[in-house]
Swiss-Prot record:
Species this protein is from: Thermus thermophilus (strain ATCC 27634 / DSM 579 / HB8)
Residue span, KARI N-terminal Rossmann domain: 1-181
Gene Ontology CC annotations of this record: cytosol
Protein name stated in the entry: Ketol-acid reductoisomerase (NADP(+))
Gene it is expressed from: ilvC
Coiled-coil spans in chain: none
This protein's UniProt keywords: Amino-acid biosynthesis, Branched-chain amino acid biosynthesis, Magnesium, Metal-binding, NADP, Oxidoreductase
HAMAP family xrefs: IlvC
Length: 337
């Protein structure tokens, strides 16, 4: 797998172009501000009436309605929520994209699953930072960067890849390393990670542990500390030094319990069998079709689950305990503009 760094990228491929960033949420604000600070001619495209409009202007960015921003641009980076991209593309992006322009994404979902079918005259590429927007911005400001994936879906001009690499350099990603991949691999592995491990898997493991302790008569506060609060301590060790490094840092008692009892909590082969089914549903497009239909009918399953999970006792206990820890800073995610 090829990794590219700053010396591999020529900013000239992006400095000579007008870039429109659609959206000013977590990734949008970071991309737009980093591009601006790198000397790129950037404007932000937002819906009229968007709550993000004033924020973007206050940050010193030029803000336009989506269609107008697209008409001006040579490169259009789409940083809207997955479920909104296809409609915005059909109604406001495609009719205004100049011939021979470039269409860019930070996630391959809509292109890979055919929700967006770009014209043949366009370059289509992706730069996907492997970190949240606030980190993409803060690391750039420190003179560092967040690693990113880069991929080309369509190369009409013959220079799609160097342009994508230049874009990655302009947002700071090439300082840390840019890994070449494909839209297929980025999309399918990203969805799998979210569903099986990072979001779906981890939340079920946490909830099961919390409920087991509470149902056995332990105080909910103790259960929360042991099954929720301390997750960060272990994840940080894994993040910094891998599984081996984490095990080096914990007690021998904890390490022995890890090896001898972990399979009771998460049976490895059975878990892999279930994970293969999750992956099959992603690869076949079944999940994508389900998610698109869910949005077409008003997101009833999503909303019902939000309410159900928000009502779980773990939320009330956690809220009380976090209020006792002033060193914690709650981060409220803003709606993508």
């Amino acid at each position: 797998m090829k990794i590219y760094y700053e010396h591999d990228a020529d900013l000239g491929f992006i400095l000579g172009k007008k870039v429109a960033v659609l959206g000013f949420g977590s990734q949008g604000h970071a991309h737009a501000l980093n591009l601006k600070d790198s000397g790129v001619d950037v404007r932000v495209g937002l819906r009229k009436g968007s709550r993000s409009w004033e924020k973007a202007e206050a940050a010193g960015l030029r803000v336009l309605p989506v269609a107008e921003a697209v008409r001006e641009a040579d490169v259009v980076m789409v940083l809207l929520p997955d479920e909104k991209q296809a409609q915005v593309y059909r109604e406001e992006v495609e009719p205004n994209l100049k011939e021979g322009g470039a269409l860019a994404f930070a996630h391959g979902f809509n292109v890979h699953f055919g929700q967006i079918k770009p014209r043949k005259d366009l370059d289509v590429w992706m730069v996907a930072p492997k970190g949240p927007g606030h980190l993409v911005r803060s690391e750039y400001q420190k003179g560092s960067g967040v690693p990113a994936l880069v991929a080309v879906h369509q190369d009409a001009s013959g220079s799609a890849f160097p342009t994508a690499l230049a874009y990655a350099k302009a947002i700071g990603a090439a300082r840390a390393g840019v890994i070449a991949t494909t839209f297929k691999d980025e999309t399918e592995t990203d969805l799998f990670g979210e569903q099986a491990v990072l979001c779906g898997g981890l939340t079920r493991l946490i909830r099961a542990g919390f409920e087991t302790l509470v149902e056995a008569g332990y105080p909910p506060e103790m259960a929360y500390f042991e099954t929720v609060h301390e997750v960060k301590l272990i994840v940080d060790l894994i993040y910094e030094a891998g599984l081996k490094g984490m095990r080096y840092s914990i007690s021998n008692t904890a390490e022995y319990g890890d090896y001898t009892r972990g399979d009771l909590a998460v049976p490895l082969e059975e878990t892999k069998r279930r994970m293969r089914e999750i992956l099959r549903q992603i690869q076949s497009g079944e999940f994508a079709r389900e998610w698109m239909l869910e949005n077409q009918v008003g997101s009833p399953v999503l909303e019902a689950n939000r309410k159900r999970w928000a009502a779980h006792p773990i939320e009330e206990v956690g809220s009380r305990l976090r209020a006792m820890m002033p060193f914690l800073k709650a981060r409220v995610m803003e709606e993508v503009g």
